[in-house]
């Protein structure tokens, strides 16, 4: 099963984290600069680690060179609700810091 999510990338952040912005968008904060694909690789690594999936199961399908990205997550055991439940602890921790 594949799920596509839209995220806003925020490169050169102090910490790597998954958060929600004031508009309710899912944001991926990464410490890498947006050069030579470093930020995109860090986004994939962070999402995969958070969801406990192999990095090969996370793919940026649109927005390789811009901040707004579409990401495909492939997993045989995660549906959309389970995906959000897996991301929530990470987001809640960063929302209240």
From Swiss-Prot:
It holds the Pfam family DUF167. Transmembrane segments: none annotated. SMART domains: DUF167. It comes from the Bacteria. GO terms for cellular component: cytoplasm. InterPro entries: DUF167, YggU-like_sf. PANTHER family: UPF0235 PROTEIN C15ORF40. Belongs to the UPF0235 family. This is UPF0235 protein Aasi_0294. It comes from Amoebophilus asiaticus (strain 5a2).
């Amino acid at each position: 099963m594949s799920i596509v999510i839209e995220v806003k990338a925020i490169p050169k952040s102090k910490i790597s984290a998954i958060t929600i912005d004031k508009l309710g968008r899912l944001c991926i904060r990464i410490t890498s600069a947006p050069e030579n694909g470093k930020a995109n690789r860090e986004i994939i690594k962070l999402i995969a680690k958070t969801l406990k999936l192999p990095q090969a199961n996370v793919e940026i399908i649109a927005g390789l060179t811009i901040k707004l990205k579409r990401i495909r997550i492939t997993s045989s055991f995660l549906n959309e609700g389970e995906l959000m439940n897996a991301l929530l602890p990470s987001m809640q921790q960063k929302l209240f810091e």
